[in-house]
Amino acid sequence: MYPAHLLVLLAVCVSLLGAASIPPQPLNLVQFSYLIQCANHGSRATWHYTDYGCYCGSGGSGTPVDELDRCCQTHDNCYAEAEKKGCYPKMSAYDYYCGGDGPYCRNIKKECQRFVCDCDVEAAKCFARAPYNDANWNIDTKKRCQ
């Protein structure tokens, strides 16, 4: 990932924290962004997924607009399941590696870390498989995500 992309990702993360009115905390979003870049082999910058459709980015509601948005909805649901297990998915750090065929979780013994890593790896691979429709980026969610 290029340094400029990291700065953009950091700026997005900071603005999302401010917009959500929650105190700053360590997030695994940087790890998730690396998994996304690994899965799509750097073909699309991570920030393209931060405001896509009804579910990619902060929150989510309504009917997903396409396959990529369904990937984000599934990821949101996976994080919700992690929280039901007593995990903190946005704060869980884990060990992973990037192979030629995509990202994988590596040697994770703790249940919460493993669960969250699996959520993130599956989402990253789903993002890489799904078509990206520029028309679904930065949509009016109040109109399209009922």
UniProtKB/Swiss-Prot annotation:
GO biological process: arachidonate secretion; lipid catabolic process; phospholipid metabolic process
One Pfam family per UniProt: Phospholip_A2_1
Tissue specificity of this protein: Expressed by the venom gland.
Enzyme Commission number, as recorded: 3.1.1.4
Keyword Disulfide bond belongs to the record: yes
Disulfide bond positions: 38-98, 54-145, 56-72, 71-126, 78-119, 87-112, 105-117
Active site: 75, 120
Residues holding Ca(2+): 55, 57, 59, 76
SUPFAM superfamilies noted in UniProt: Phospholipase A2, PLA2
Cofactor mode of binding and number, as noted: Binds 1 Ca(2+) ion.
Subcellular location: Secreted
One example GO MF annotation: phospholipid binding
Family matches, as PROSITE patterns: PA2_ASP, PA2_HIS
GO terms under cellular component: extracellular region
Main location: secreted
Propeptide span(s): 20-27
Signal peptide residue numbers: 1-19
Entry keywords, A to Z: Calcium, Disulfide bond, Hemostasis impairing toxin, Hydrolase, Lipid degradation, Lipid metabolism, Metal-binding, Platelet aggregation inhibiting toxin, Secreted, Signal, Toxin
The keyword Cytoplasm belongs to this UniProt entry's keyword annotation: no
EC category name: hydrolase
Required cofactor(s): Ca(2+)
Family statement drawn from the similarity comment of this UniProt entry: Belongs to the phospholipase A2 family. Group I subfamily. D49 sub-subfamily.
Free-text function comment from the UniProt entry: Snake venom phospholipase A2 (PLA2) that inhibits collagen-induced platelet aggregation. PLA2 catalyzes the calcium-dependent hydrolysis of the 2-acyl groups in 3-sn-phosphoglycerides.
Protein name (Swiss-Prot/TrEMBL): Acidic phospholipase A2 S4-30
Organism for this UniProt entry: Austrelaps superbus (Lowland copperhead snake)
